[in-house]
From Swiss-Prot:
It comes from the Bacteria. The lineage of its organism: Bacteria, Pseudomonadati, Pseudomonadota, Gammaproteobacteria, Enterobacterales. This is Nitrogenase iron protein. The reversible ADP-ribosylation of Arg-101 inactivates the nitrogenase reductase and regulates nitrogenase activity. It comes from Pectobacterium atrosepticum (strain SCRI 1043 / ATCC BAA-672). The modification ADP-ribosylarginine is found at R101.
Length: 293
């Protein structure tokens, strides 16, 4: 099978890295050959696969030796659970330079040094938060990742972020082959969450590829720096990640999304009771003015 390059996006803190690593562990269990490229300065995209606090990043190691040209592939590529190949792009210190540029430099280095071996089935790019700048859009802008999955939940800001990411996909889909593969709902146990994400997916022209229920075993595994698949392979949550993996392997629905307008998104949120209808009579009024009324 041809190598599939997938990028995982979503709001910061939504559980992208945890979901990605559990998905990858499930794919590895199926015998798939995989590489994860962390595209986040936090460098937490591979820690559950490697049982590590944080992998040494390409940008950190380049700074230590002088430049990225002075690095060897074995310096930055580690092998973890299920023979998954792991690399972290990293970025500059907070407040200095552009972390997005680190992503560009790191992926170019991995390509030039032969990290993308011929027998890989999947490459996953775990990307920082929203598409906030051109650097973090690099995996889709440069046609590296052609398949995008957005991790979201039934919370308002997670849905806003998912919609914004769709706008970024549309921009680059016009000039390349990037497509949206679907939404992964990483549940926060909000009311009617699965119905809401299915409705959002339909509105933007895609699918909710899987609903991952909330389960404390995910945190128990994380404390041990392990995926659920490895920590407790027989639990129900491990089977959820296996189902997600199977659905992604079989997925043929790859679309150019149609992002919602802000009004459409707010109407959907009001329909499901996430947002209350706006009362225009209270806008701009102080507490004193409201009490006097």
């Amino acid at each position: 099978m041809a190598m599939r390059q997938c990028a995982i996006y979503g709001k910061g803190g939504i559980g992208k890295s945890t979901t990605t690593q559990n998905l990858v562990a499930a794919l590895a269990e199926m015998g798939k050959k995989i590489m994860i490229v962390g595209c986040d300065p936090k460098a937490d995209s591979t820690r559950l696969i490697l049982h590590a606090k944080a992998q040494n990043t390409i940008m950190e190691m380049a700074a230590e030796v002088g430049s990225v040209e002075d690095l060897e592939l074995e310096d930055v590529l580690q092998i973890g659970y299920g023979n998954v190949r792991c690399a972290e792009s990293g970025g500059p210190e907070p407040g200095v330079g552009c972390a997005g540029r680190g992503v560009i430099t790191a992926i170019n280095f991995l390509e030039e040094e032969g990290a993308y071996v011929d027998d890989l089935d999947f490459v996953f790019y775990d990307v920082l938060g929203d598409v906030v700048c051109g650097g973090f859009a690099m995996p889709i802008r440069e046609n590296k990742a052609q398949e995008i999955y957005i991790v979201c939940s039934g919370e308002m800001m997670a849905m806003y972020a998912a919609n914004n990411i769709c706008k970024g996909i549309v921009k680059y889909a016009k000039t390349g082959k990037v497509r949206l593969g679907g939404l992964i709902c990483n549940s926060r146990n909000t009311d009617r969450e699965d119905e809401l994400i299915i409705a959002l997916a339909e509105k933007i022209g895609t699918q909710m590829i899987h609903f991952v229920p909330r389960d404390n075993i995910v945190q128990r595994a994380e404390i041990r720096r392990m995926t659920v698949i490895e920590y407790d392979p027989n639990c129900s949550q491990a089977n959820e990640y296996r189902q997600l993996a199977q659905k992604i392997v079989a997925n043929t629905m790859k679309v150019i999304p149609v992002p919602c307008t802000m009004d459409e998104l707010e109407e959907l949120l009001m329909e499901f009771g996430i947002m209350e209808e706006e009362d225009t009579t209270i806008i701009g009024k102080t507490a004193a003015e409201e009490n006097a009324a």
